[in-house]
Amino acid sequence: MLNKIYDWVDERLDITPMWRDIADHEVPEHVNPAHHFSAFVYCFGGLTFFVTVIQVLSGMFLTMYYVPDIKNAWESVYYLQNEVAFGQIVRGMHHWGASLVIVMMFLHTLRVFFQGAYKKPRELNWIVGVLIFFVMLGLGFTGYLLPWDMKALFATKVGLQIAEATPLIGTQVKTLLAGHPDIVGAQTLTRFFAIHVFFLPAALFGLMAAHFIMIRKQGISGPL
C-alpha cells in the first residue's frame, strides 16, 4: 500500500533522486569517530541540531496550554506542570534543553575556531553561525519571562536595562522589547511571547537552512 503511494508520488515528482542524494552522501573519514577517536568533536554541530529539534517539538506542546496573559500565564504553567499528562517532563525537557543547546553551540563554536574552520572559503558560514548563536541567546532570554513569576520578572528587568545601555538606540530597543519605556507588564509579556514563538524561530530556521546548504556545498573542513 505504502509502496504504491510512494511510486505514484515518485512518478510525478521524481523524489527518489532528491532523498537518495541526501541518504547516500558520503561522510569524510576524518569526521567518523569509528576511524578517529578525536572525530567526536565534529558531532557538536549535529548534537546542537538534535537538541534544537527537541526544543521545537517540546515548545509546540507547551504552546497548546500556555496563555500569554499576565492574569493567566503563571496559572497555565502551573496547570501544565501539575495537571497535564507528561507536562512536567516536557517542560523540564524544554527548560534544560534551553541550557544544553547553548552549551553544545559553545562547544561547536570552539571546535570551529580552534581548527580554523572559519577561514576562507567558509567565512560567510561562520557569520551565519554566529548569528544563529545570538538568535539562540535571544530565544533563551525571551522564554525566561514567559512563566511570569518573580524570578522571571526581575531577570527580564535586568535584561532590559542591559538593552537600554546600548549606545544611541538603547531607549528605543528597550521600548521595542518591553512595549513601554518604564513598565514591564502585559505588553512586555505579549511581545516576548511573539518574539519567542514567531520572530526568532523564523530567523533561526532561515539561518539554519543557509548554514546547512553552505556546509553541503563547501563540505566539512579538514583537521589541522
Swiss-Prot record:
Cofactor: heme b; heme c
Amino-acid positions noted as binding heme b 2 in the UniProt annotation, renumbered to this chain: R91, H94, H196
Co-factor binding comment: Binds 2 heme b groups non-covalently with two histidine residues as axial ligands.
GO function terms (MF aspect): electron transfer activity; metal ion binding; oxidoreductase activity
Domain of life (superkingdom): Bacteria
Keyword Hydrolase annotated: no
Binding site for heme c: C43, R216, I220
Entry-linked Pfam families: Cytochrome_B
TM segment ranges: 37-57, 96-116, 126-146, 195-215
GO terms of biological process kind: respiratory electron transport chain
Keywords annotated in UniProt: Cell membrane, Electron transport, Heme, Iron, Membrane, Metal-binding, Transmembrane, Transmembrane helix, Transport
Record flagged with keyword RNA-binding: no
Subunit organization: The main subunits of the menaquinol:cytochrome c complex are a Rieske-type iron-sulfur protein (QcrA), a cytochrome b (QcrB) and a cytochrome c (QcrC).
Family: Belongs to the cytochrome b family.
More details: This cytochrome b is similar to other bacterial and plant chloroplast cytochrome b6 proteins in binding one of three hemes with a single thioether bond.
UniProt function note: Component of the menaquinol:cytochrome c reductase complex.
Stored PANTHER family: CYTOCHROME B
Entry protein name: Menaquinol:cytochrome c reductase cytochrome b subunit
Gene name tied to this protein: qcrB
